[in-house]
């Protein structure tokens, strides 16, 4: 279960983060299988580690797993209860190669407090097509 997966102690350890991401991808595929949604790790990832993460119902998909709230978003008028991020360079790369690709945000964190900010428990899976997400991000007040 993903509750036992822990982030690397060194935030700059890219190899450890990639390994953790691979574990989350496998767990997410299992979760979708329990929901009778056909999913697998993208076979292209063996040759290209930057290839999209998954194939879901035959469609290319990317997984973003979030396990920590962004407490400081409250300073920008964005609720930290559900705030997340995505790298602009990731969106630009995927728009060029597969604009209709789906991105899944798999989110879980318990209710907690940090930096004087309380957040509620957040648990769920949200998804959007990359081209739609780009439009949202292009018009976002925070870049």
Residue ranges and their predicted role:
Residues 1-45:
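Acidic-basic catalytic patches of nuclease active cores, encompassing PD-(D/E)XK
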Residues 1-4, 23, 31, 106-143:
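Non-catalytic C-terminal interaction segments of nucleic acid-processing enzymes
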Residues 11-18, 64-114:
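Catalytic cores of nucleic-acid endonucleases
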Residues 28, 32, 52-75:
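Conserved catalytic cores of phosphodiester-cleaving nucleases, focusing on short active-site segments
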Residues 34-38, 96-102, 134-135:
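Structural alpha-beta junctions
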Residues 40, 55, 60-62, 102-107:
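A structural signal for short, well-ordered beta-strand segments and their strand-loop junctions
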Residues 41-49, 104-111:
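Acidic carboxylate-rich catalytic motifs and surrounding loops in phosphoryl-/glycosyl-chemistry enzymes
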Residues 46-58, 93-94:
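Short amphipathic alpha-helices and their capping/turn segments at secondary-structure boundaries
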């Amino acid at each position: 279960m993903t509750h036992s997966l822990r982030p690397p102690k060194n935030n700059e350890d890219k190899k450890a983060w990639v390994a953790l991401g691979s574990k989350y991808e496998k767990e997410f595929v299992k979760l979708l299988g329990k929901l009778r949604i056909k999913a697998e790790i993208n076979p292209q990832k063996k040759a290209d580690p930057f290839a999209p993460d998954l194939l879901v119902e035959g469609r290319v998909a990317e997984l973003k797993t979030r396990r920590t709230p962004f407490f400081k978003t409250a300073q920008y008028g964005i609720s930290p209860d559900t705030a997340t991020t995505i790298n602009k360079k990731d969106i630009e790369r995927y728009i060029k190669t597969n604009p209709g690709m789906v991105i899944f945000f798999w989110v879980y964190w318990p209710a907690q407090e940090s930096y004087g900010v309380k957040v509620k428990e957040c648990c769920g899976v949200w998804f959007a097509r990359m081209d739609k997400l780009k439009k949202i991000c292009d018009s976002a007040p925070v870049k």
